[in-house]
Amino acid sequence: MSELVADPTGRAVLRAVAPGTELRDGLERILRGRTGALIVLGYDEVVEEMCSGGFVLDVAFSATRLRELAKMDGAIVLDRGATRVLRAAVQLLPDAAIETGESGTRHRTAERAAKQTGFPVISVSQSMRIVAIYSDGRRWVLEDSDAILSRANQALATLERYKSRLDEVSGTLSALEIEDLVTVRDVASVVQRLEMVRRISVEIAGYVDELGTDGRLLSLQLDELIGNVGPERELVVSDYVDARRAAALDDVLAGLARLDSTDLIDLVKIAQVRGLGGPGGDALDSAVGPRGHRMLSKIPRLPSPVIGAMVDHFGTLQKMLSASVEDLQLVDGVGALRARSVREGLSRLAESSLLERFV
């Protein structure tokens, strides 16, 4: 179900049926009992008009109740949060004109009902013993936790390799920024790795949602690996984006997210999205300079408004590096104590970045 993970609605559906939830327990009971079921996750006027027969319950949801109600013919209607059983043994009559790619009666009804109501609809196949979820015009099949964990562990190993390479190119960029030797290629390489890490981490986050209580360890490993990758991505873009365009940061981040896998390995394409390297983005060896957001963010206890004020005042990282304590105090919000802290912080960062590169 990895295609769900970038979609907030899909993520919510995954969490609703993840292991450890009452709904998942009920679905597994239905499978073990070798019966089928049709379950609507939501209720409004559209669903009410679609329902025929059955009876109104409006009782608290439980896995055992779901299992017993599934023994009867007809669909079960739950509230959106799957906390109450609203109706049972109803016949769903969705619009027959709605297209469906399914062949079985239960699955055809589920797909049409999901499209017509906008609510997720779950179909449990009695013969094939599978659970299918229909939502937003798509279909997903629930899998066993072991199969999901196997894919998740492979993705986690890939993330570890990506993160290791990201740390390397990020450290190199820091040293080059200190020496004022940054090229478009260096920036594009870091952005490329940041986007690759972001994408694989989003996929793993989807597995965490899908695994529910079985994904706790995976979630801890993911949090430890990605750390501050999200803020780092925005800081790198901010350092090399056109400061005169208010929407430039969001435009670049959105453009990077739209790149397909083939374009993402092409540094020229990445440079084009960032507006670097000339009109065609192919001048990868042309020199560029950072504004200083990323380097200043590494100084402890330096608030974001002060970082923004310093970047606006000096314009480039090189001017900050050459600024004295007195020069730093000219920035709004920077007193003598903070100026000395920034001056010492920049000096330590410059020294450590160069040491990491050459040692």
UniProtKB/Swiss-Prot annotation:
SUPFAM superfamilies: RuvA domain 2-like, YojJ-like
Residues involved in ATP binding: 74, 92, 105-109
Obligatory cofactor(s): Mg(2+)
Annotated catalysed reactions: 2 ATP = 3',3'-c-di-AMP + 2 diphosphate
Domain named DAC: residues: 7-145
The protein's enzyme class: transferase
Protein's GO biological process: DNA repair
Domain of life according to the entry: Bacteria
EC number: 2.7.7.85
Gene3D superfamilies (alphabetical): 5' to 3' exonuclease, C-terminal subdomain, DNA integrity scanning linker region, DNA integrity scanning protein, DisA, N-terminal domain
Keywords, sorted A to Z: ATP-binding, DNA damage, DNA repair, DNA-binding, Magnesium, Nucleotide-binding, Nucleotidyltransferase, Transferase
Any one Gene Ontology molecular-function term assigned to this protein's record: ATP binding
UniProt feature coiled coil, ranges: none
PROSITE patterns: DAC
Family: Belongs to the DisA family.
Purpose of the protein: Participates in a DNA-damage check-point. DisA forms globular foci that rapidly scan along the chromosomes searching for lesions. Also has diadenylate cyclase activity, catalyzing the condensation of 2 ATP molecules into cyclic di-AMP (c-di-AMP). c-di-AMP likely acts as a signaling molecule that may couple DNA integrity with a cellular process.
Subunit structure: Homooctamer.
Protein name: DNA integrity scanning protein DisA
Lineage: Bacteria, Bacillati, Actinomycetota, Actinomycetes, Micrococcales
